[in-house]
């Protein structure tokens, strides 16, 4: 009965600082969009050119860490004393479901165009060599390497959850073995948590900024409603209201059902694209791209282009590594929670094999379709981007498929549901992280969830107002910098504690 009388509420030291920082940055941006774009370009150039190498080494070192976990002294250690909570098939399916966000649909549909129009290694734009390397680079950015880094952090969080029985809702909770309880629960831990929250807020706002134009462009195609910034703002507002209604009326089960529908619909849509786009070409292109990936892998891992300064690794590899870094803690906590009872080796292999298969299927099917449409001159992506923006170009890659109306309805529903679940997850994660006395499995206060969803929505609108991909890329890279150090500290804390307390 004592536990039932716990008083939940905001934790001021991790609620107000991120709110104030993000609020000030949004206000300064809206106040002068042109000046904001100048600052954004400067920040992007500085971080990617001066510190891009650090992100590349981080990924390589974490890959070696994955091998250490799989073949080292903890490989057969079980994460908890209970049997696995989910069957292997359900476990893999839940991993796949976590990959089917609207932001992933965004990049999967258009990424290959950028790789072949501005290719790496001094290749000619739109050349045969650029096209051969295009999908290979997608497989590199969304393949075993980043998932291996997530494996290490997932093992770390699963260890703290199920072996050490810690309640972890913020990264500072895991740092006690590394810096001591005094610092982990004091000013140092508060700073770490605030870095994490500010970065996460911008990351979620970025995802919303990518997802919203896809929905509004679908609306223009299906209903003839012109796509404007005002329409984007209205749609984001509707999502926030819908999220508030779901939370207030206890409709979270409905949100979970929507998440399942999203996963099944993703399978259906990908299968449709695979069949009608050209299954034989897709499989041949994928096979060839795996070979290209293996051939160029050493160069890709360490490519910084300091002599030619073409900008490809800064604009894409460093950006994506920052993307993975910024979502690492949130994603790893989720993957850890669904992996109770599995061994370290099972978790590491399951994540790398299962999640790589998920992202490789997405990027192979969608990227191959886009390349075919370009080669057959069915759509002119450069003109579409110049006149209408990236989202319109993505929509046209789907609208060019047979049964275009049915296809567009499917894509519209998929993007809409994916974004509803995104807003719900955003508000829940941020509210859990900024409230006190809210335990895992409990619902944080309604007003706090609504407040965070509003702020994330505002960030999405601000990024859309700035226009283009550079503000989105910069928000991710800037947010990834502090999380780079936080992720390393969580990793070191796990290693130190495991050596002391996870013995035979």
From Swiss-Prot:
(R)-carnitine 1 binds at residues 142, 323-324. Residues 31-51, 99-131, 220-230, 278-311, 373-403, 467-468 are periplasmic. Residues 1-12, 68-90, 152-186, 249-253, 336-349, 432-446, 491-504 are cytoplasmic. Inhibited by the sulfhydryl reagent N-ethylmaleimide, but not by the ionophore carbonyl cyanide m-chlorophenylhydrazone (CCCP). One of its GO terms (molecular function) is carnitine transmembrane transporter activity. Changing residue 288 to A: Retains 70% of transport activity. Forms mostly monomers. Disruption phenotype: Essential, it cannot be deleted. 4-(trimethylamino)butanoate 1 binds at residues 114, 315-316. Changing residue 295 to E: Does not affect transport activity. Forms mostly monomers. Can also form small amounts of homodimers and homotrimers. The keyword Transport applies. The keyword Cell inner membrane applies. GO terms for biological process: 4-(trimethylammonio)butanoate transport; carnitine metabolic process; carnitine transport. It is found in: Cell inner membrane. Pfam families: BCCT (PF02028). It catalyses: 4-(trimethylamino)butanoate(in) + (R)-carnitine(out) = 4-(trimethylamino)butanoate(out) + (R)-carnitine(in). InterPro entries: BCCT_CS (IPR018093), BCCT_transptr (IPR000060), BCCT_transptr_CaiT (IPR023449). Its main location: membrane. One of its GO terms (cellular component) is plasma membrane. Pathway: Amine and polyamine metabolism; carnitine metabolism. HAMAP family: CaiT. Belongs to the BCCT transporter (TC 2.A.15) family. CaiT subfamily. Catalyzes the exchange of L-carnitine for gamma-butyrobetaine. Can also transport D-carnitine and, with lower efficiency, acetyl-L-carnitine and glycine betaine. Contains two carnitine binding sites, a primary binding site at the center of the protein and a secondary binding site at the bottom of the intracellular vestibule. Contains two gamma-butyrobetaine binding sites, one in the central transport site, the other in an extracellular binding pocket. Binding of both butyrobetaine molecules is cooperative, indicating that the extracellular site is regulatory. The occupied regulatory site may increase the binding affinity of the transport site and initiates substrate translocation. Homotrimer. The monomer is stable in the membrane and is fully functional, but physical contact between the protomers of a trimer may facilitate conformational alterations associated with substrate binding. This is L-carnitine/gamma-butyrobetaine antiporter. The gene is caiT.
């Amino acid at each position: 009965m004592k536990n039932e009388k716990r008083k939940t509420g905001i934790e001021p030291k991790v609620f107000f600082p991120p709110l104030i920082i993000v609020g000030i940055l949004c206000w300064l941006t809206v106040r002068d969009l042109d000046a904001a774009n100048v600052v954004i370009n400067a920040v992007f150039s500085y971080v990617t050119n001066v510190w891009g190498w650090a992100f590349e080494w981080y990924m390589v070192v974490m890959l070696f860490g994955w091998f250490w976990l799989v073949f080292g002294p903890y490989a057969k250690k079980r994460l908890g004393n209970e049997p696995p909570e989910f069957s292997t098939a359900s476990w893999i399916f839940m991993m796949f479901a976590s990959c089917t966000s609207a932001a992933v649909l965004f990049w999967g549909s258009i990424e290959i165009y950028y790789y072949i129009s501005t290719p790496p290694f001094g290749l000619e734009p739109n050349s045969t060599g650029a096209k051969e390397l295009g999908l290979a680079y997608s497989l590199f950015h969304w393949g075993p390497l980043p998932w291996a880094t997530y494996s290490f952090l997932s093992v770390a969080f699963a260890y703290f959850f199920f072996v050490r029985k810690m309640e972890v809702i913020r990264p500072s909770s895991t740092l006690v073995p590394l810096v001591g309880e005094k610092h982990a629960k004091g000013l140092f831990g508060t700073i770490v948590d605030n870095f994490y929250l500010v970065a996460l807020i911008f990351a979620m706002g970025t995802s919303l900024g990518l997802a919203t134009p896809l929905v509004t462009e679908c609306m223009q195609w299906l209903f003839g409603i012109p796509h404007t910034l005002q329409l984007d703002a209205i749609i984001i507002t509707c999502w926030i209201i819908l999220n508030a209604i779901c939370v207030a009326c206890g409709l979270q089960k409905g949100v979970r059902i929507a998440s399942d529908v999203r996963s099944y619909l993703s399978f259906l849509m990908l299968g449709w694209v695979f069949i009608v786009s050209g299954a034989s070409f897709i499989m041949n292109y994928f096979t060839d791209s795996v070979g290209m990936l293996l051939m160029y892998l050493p160069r890709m891992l360490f490519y910084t282009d300091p002599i030619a300064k073409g900008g490809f690794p800064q604009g894409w590899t460093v950006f994506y590594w920052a993307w993975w870094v910024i979502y690492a803690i949130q994603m790893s906590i989720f993957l850890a929670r669904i992996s109770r009872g599995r061994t370290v080796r099972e978790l590491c292999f399951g994540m790398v094999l299962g999640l790589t298969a998920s992202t490789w299927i997405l990027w192979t099917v969608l990227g191959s379709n886009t390349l075919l449409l370009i080669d057959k001159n069915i759509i002119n992506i450069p003109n579409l981007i110049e006149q209408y923006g990236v989202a319109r170009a993505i929509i046209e890659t789907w609208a060019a498929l047979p049964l275009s109306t049915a296809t567009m309805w499917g894509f519209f529903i998929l993007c809409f549901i994916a974004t509803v679940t995104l807003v719900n997850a955003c508000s829940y994660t941020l509210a859990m992280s900024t409230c006190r006395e809210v335990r895992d499995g409990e619902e944080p206060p309604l007003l706090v969830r609504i407040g965070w969803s509003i702020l994330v929505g505002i960030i999405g609108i601000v990024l859309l107002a700035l226009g283009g991909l550079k503000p989105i890329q910069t928000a991710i890279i800037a947010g990834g910098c502090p999380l780079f150090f936080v992720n390393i500290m969580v990793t070191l804390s796990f290693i130190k504690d495991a050596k002391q307390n996870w013995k035979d």
